[in-house]
Design a protein with these regions (language model features):
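Second-shell loop/turn segments in exported
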Residues: 108-114, 187
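Domain-core detector
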Residues: 1-81, 87-104, 122, 127, ...
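Functional cores of ribonucleases/endoribonucleases
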Residues: 41-49, 54-60, 128-204
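Conserved hydrophobic ligand-interaction patch in extracellular adhesion modules
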Residues: 117
């Protein structure tokens, strides 16, 4: 299958300084983030056209990740008018998956095997008086929330015997939490999402 749904230029060999100049960094209320992305050689994912014509089955499958050499049992098209594709997902070099560069969670997990010091657990947040719906920064300035184990209930992240997924917030600096998260496994896989687990980027 051709990777027609990946409309990115390969940037793995581009100097980091040059890559950063093309990165969209906006801190604050506007939480849009577009990291410099290449094409994954390890993972592919299901891509669905989201409009009024989309069916439940296609919408549910959107974003599911498969190994590049994996055979998909129920591959698209699922029906006569299906417009879904399975193609190579985007990859991002560690240090570009968040707005914080080498201080970001993607860099720290990739090269240190843990979150940065500024991540705080829910238990610690509540101990500081945090109430749901309130701005986290009011209770933990300059910190982000570590969510603990991510259940992967929809099975969109790759599964394997003994694999456990974890999650943490990224990229918010004021106001409410945004839709950006990082997820990583106990066996070395790292992905980021900027739309609350609908689609992912591989961190390499």
């Amino acid at each position: 299958m051709q990777n027609s749904c990946v409309r990115v230029k390969e940037k793995r060999k581009m100097p980091i300084q040059k890559m950063m100049r093309g990165t969209i960094l906006r801190k604050g209320k506007n939480d849009f983030y577009a990291p410099p992305a290449g094409q994954s050689y390890r993972w592919k994912h299901w891509v669905t056209e989201h409009d009024i014509k989309v069916c439940v089955a296609c919408k549910t499958a959107h974003g599911k990740i498969y190994a590049m050499d994996e055979t998909v049992d129920a591959a698209p098209p699922l029906h006569f008018n299906c417009r879904c594709e399975i193609c190579a997902m985007n990859s991002v070099i560690a240090g570009f998956g968040t707005k914080d560069g080498t201080d970001g969670a993607d860099w720290w997990i990739k090269y240190n095997g843990r979150l940065p010091e500024y991540d705080i657990s829910w238990e610690e947040m509540y101990a500081r008086g945090y109430k749901p719906g309130k701005p986290p920064r009011k209770y933990a300035p300059d910190m982000m929330i570590y969510g603990g184990v991510y259940s992967n209930d929809n099975g969109h992240l790759p599964s394997a015997p003994g694999r456990v997924w974890y999650e943490a917030d990224i990229n918010y600096y004021e106001g409410q939490r945004n839709r950006h998260r990082i997820v990583w496994s106990n066996d070395g896989l790292i992905f980021v999402t900027y739309d609350h687990y609908e689609t992912f980027y591989e961190i390499i």
